[in-house]
Amino acid sequence: MDASQSPLPQLPSLSDLESRMQVMRVSALDDNQTGETFSQRAEWFYQRSPLLLSLCQDLYDGYATLLDRFNQNPKQVIPHDNDTDTDITSEVESILSFQQMEVSTCDMQKNIEDLVSQLVTANLEKDTAKHILQRREQTLQEACKTIGLLKKLVMLLDMEKEVAVEETANLGHKLTSLLEENRELASEALFMKNEAVKLARCVLKMRDEHFHKMCHLQNQIYELQSSREPVYENESSQSCFGLENSKKKSKKRKMSETRSETGEKMRSKWFKRLNTINPFTKCSITPLSSPLYHAAL
């Protein structure tokens, strides 16, 4: 038998076992009161799991010690041979039960380690998923804020667009009114131009008429002067002094010179007045170029 052949392990004291059991009870009460969190489960995995394993190991050592003592005591205490069969059967049953308990404790230890590792991995995955979910929620909130700002910007742009459309319509109305005014002014300018042309024609016609009248008056004056010359000649022939004839001739010359000078002055005054009457066209008729003037001379 392996348990009897191997040296007995050193068992812990009863007070040590009680203290460790008390720690396990307190930790169990704390878990029931506060609930399970990731930090508590990690603390349990790294601190309380070794304590539980050590308690299981102590329990196994205690069972091994009790089995060894039980195997030694029946040979010394019990003197009857009739009970040997029952002792052997009970010993075999205890050995089998102890082996089953040993196997079950090992399996339980492995199962506990597997469960703890699964819990830790599940909690890590849960925390990772929660962190990813929080980041996605933050991204979603930022996207919602951005969408709200974009909506406000679109509303402002629509308002500016409406204002620009109204301003464009007002400018279009102003442009049409200015075009109409321009057309009216153009028509008025054309009318004024036609009226100016008519006025210029009238002025030219009046100037020609005045010039013809003036030439006719000059001709009449010249005829009157020429009709008076024979009378002066007859009077000069009756006189007997040659000095008087010379004086008369000089007087005639002076009169003719003054007559020509006064005629020229009058003609120049008339032409100046006619030139100042028409502001649009200049006079193309001058005293020297007029055929009537030459005829009058």
Curated annotation (Swiss-Prot):
Its main location: cytoplasm. Residues 235-265 are annotated as: Disordered. Keywords: Coiled coil, Cytoplasm. The keyword Cytoplasm applies. Residues 1-77 form the NAB domain. GO terms for molecular function: actin binding. May be involved in the receptor-like kinase-mediated signal transduction pathway. This is Kinase-interacting family protein.
